[in-house]
Amino acid sequence: MQHAQRPTWPHKDLLDVTQLTRAELFHLLDTAAQFHDINRRPVKKVPTLKGKSVVLFFAEPSTRTKTSFDVAGKRLSADTFSLAKSGSSLSKGESLKDTALTLQAMTPDIIVIRHSSSGAAQFLAERLDCSVVNAGDGWHAHPTQALLDCYSLRQVWGDTFEGRTLLILGDIAHSRVARSNVHLLSSLGVKVRLCAPRTLLPAGVHNWPVTIFNRLDDAVQGVDAVMCLRLQLERQQAGLLPDLREYAQRFCLSPRHLTMAAPSARVLHPGPMNRGLEISSVLADAPESLILDQVAAGVATRMAILFLLATRTGIEQTADNGGRA
């Protein structure tokens, strides 16, 4: 069988979107599109990573990201193993380095890590021989979420990112999702706007490649997409928020706001949602919503990431070759 030659994947790890060139980004997205097609078939499992092992090391609570990686690994026929902080020696005072070295002794091919400390994924990547995927480190980065968001927007926009406008709405200060999306989408020529209470904007935000708004009615004018962020309710207890009812009145995205956006504007949310606080239920379930598309994109994109890291292949993967590169 003939195989089409493709560029080899040069990275051992995926730690941040900033490490990817434009060509590498679109190679990853093209690979995700192939897996997205496979995921729509009656039989979704392929033997591509049979014999490979993936450890899901989540030292922070997670449902969506962890499940998405687990499904992605299993659909590639990899063996996946989950480790939560409560079930690891970290909860007994063991250092991250010692836990990581213990995991490496088990010879996994990939470790997917989520940790409350910024830089935790890079710390592991510099010390371990296996590949490391950053599934969220503190407030620093969430590269796989930004990649799946980019994939979801590409399904609507095609490759025409230049000149588009995206509004990110909500708790920017504590959002690694916002940081990764700002870096990735602005690098593609997307004009990024932020809208949040002043207390929920991060220090140094004026150095970001963004335009900042305090009023949602102004921020949403003419945008091509709105990304709502989860409002972390513990911030309200810390005095960073006004009354929640007041917040919803000022910053909850509604169908009225979407009438001010571009005619084909779409809505995204990384989840979990607080309906009626960050986004109205009507809009979350509307045809303009890409929220469920993001979930499907998450599995396909993470399949692509695991595949590229585990094989670093230069051979195009096709469904008809049984998943063998």
Swiss-Prot record:
Residues involved in L-aspartate binding: K92, R176, R230
GO terms for MF: amino acid binding; aspartate carbamoyltransferase activity
Protein name (Swiss-Prot/TrEMBL): Aspartate carbamoyltransferase catalytic subunit
First-level EC class: transferase
Gene: pyrB
Keyword Phosphoprotein on entry: no
Organism: Nitratidesulfovibrio vulgaris (strain DSM 19637 / Miyazaki F) (Desulfovibrio vulgaris)
Reactions it catalyzes: carbamoyl phosphate + L-aspartate = N-carbamoyl-L-aspartate + phosphate + H(+)
Keywords noted in UniProt: Pyrimidine biosynthesis, Transferase
One Pfam family from the record: OTCace
InterPro entries: Asp/Orn_carbamoyltranf_P-bd (IPR006132), Asp/Orn_carbamoylTrfase (IPR006130), Asp/Orn_carbamoylTrfase_sf (IPR036901), Asp_carbamoyltransf (IPR002082), Asp_carbamoyltransf_Asp/Orn-bd (IPR006131)
Enzyme Commission number(s): 2.1.3.2
Subunit structure: Heterododecamer (2C3:3R2) of six catalytic PyrB chains organized as two trimers (C3), and six regulatory PyrI chains organized as three dimers (R2).
The protein's annotated pathway: Pyrimidine metabolism; UMP biosynthesis via de novo pathway; (S)-dihydroorotate from bicarbonate: step 2/3
Keyword field contains Signal: no
